[in-house]
């Protein structure tokens, strides 16, 4: 039967199978609707009666025919009406039969089921059979002979290394992969073994996918891409089948690049023990991926490039040499890289002459390539909303505020007492930020509600930091405590506005003590999963971290007390203008003026 079905299916072809399936489903639907309508019509003409009503009909001689099926009576009256009733007691059924027969009605003992009951029994079977057949046909059509989630073809956009701004060291590392795909004999002549796989790791938005496309375009080979999550399914065996289909397509397309985005979805470390069915399906898919990466020869011209921002989750067997021979970290761009990225994304955006991309690059440390693209896009949207002909520095500055501090909520009505308390809180942050020597310069302060905050103080680093000194971290805690210190000194009370500051300060203090060894406890590490996490040691870590936070709060209180007059002047300016820039802030603190970053650069 199965072979006959397969032969007929091949003869029909894809279009014929679809038409046959649609026809079959149409017939099933017509039969189902017919049975349902018939049962509905019959039930509409019938009325359910009681035993007493049946006795009255029999005594009046209104019945012309009576059908008895078990405990069910169907009585047809002279006017065409149909009455049904269920009589459970056998003696009462016998009495009714005698009365109807005595009244001259024909009595028939029928064994057939009522049409409505037959329809209710047949309908579920027919519907389930139709749904099962449809699922069977669809599953055959979606069989993993061709992995539908693979995006094949040459690199879709002409992306080359020149279009990938920044990341000079990363591009040099990947250039050898391009040379291998272009001229593999150059490596084989000296017995060199080209890499089978390249793992790109880094923060989200740093351009890992863009780099993989650039490699394929530079080498002039096909680019097969798939997401790691597309290998995961609830059906057992589907993930492994899709892995086989992907590499089968790669062998046909060789030389080519197979790119697996977010490989941690399929390549995370296998759990110990048996686990549940979902873990078994994941392990089977991962095992198939490991086998496939070992299964092709170096001469096939297939290079697997994968990306992830969770390299710590990957299975060790996947990371060994012979599978992913090279691990390339794609870092966040430095100031030179940020300027190059801004130049690329600013190409289609009309900028006014005073827009300085190098200044923007210096003021956006920690931004990824995606963040910088989003920054310029937000600035262009603001300019278009205002009907401007070009993007000016104010648009970029407001776009940066939106990215860093959140959306401005102009419709929120804030009570005057809360506005004053918010201004005092933010002024405390500013005062500590100006006087603590290692703090990043305060760039802007605002008491306009943004996101979930009623006010924001923005401090921008002067340079990229590759490591953090103890003094810098202590000053960060002190600045975070500046808002609470101002509340205690100026308001004489405390508000809930410092909750986020306290949480961030506690996190920094705990890491300084528990992971970085920056306390009298010495160089210890009791982070998550570390074997030396004894309860007594954790208690000492908590006490030391709390003491560190309290010490910086006391220091912030002293700074606020020493600058009480300047803080009150800043509060007054904030209540008038709501948002103050660097020059307006330093006008309130003339004795604590810091040189601007552009002045230092000059």
Curated annotation (Swiss-Prot):
Which cysteines bridge via disulfide bonds?
none
EC number annotated for this UniProt entry: 3.4.24.-
Kindly state what the record says about how the cofactor is bound: Binds 1 zinc ion per subunit.
- Annotated signal sequence is none
> Which residue ranges does UniProt annotate as crossing the membrane?
19-39, 118-138
Record key words, sorted: ATP-binding, Cell inner membrane, Cell membrane, Hydrolase, Membrane, Metal-binding, Metalloprotease, Nucleotide-binding, Protease, Transmembrane, Transmembrane helix, Zinc
Q: What's the main place this protein lives?
A: membrane
NCBIfam families, per this entry? Answer: FtsH_fam (TIGR01241)
* Name used for this protein in its record: ATP-dependent zinc metalloprotease FtsH 3
Question: Origin organism of this chain?
Answer: Sorangium cellulosum (strain So ce56)
Traced from the root, the source organism's taxonomic lineage reads:
Bacteria, Pseudomonadati, Myxococcota, Polyangia, Polyangiales
Task: Give the encoding gene's name.
Answer: ftsH3
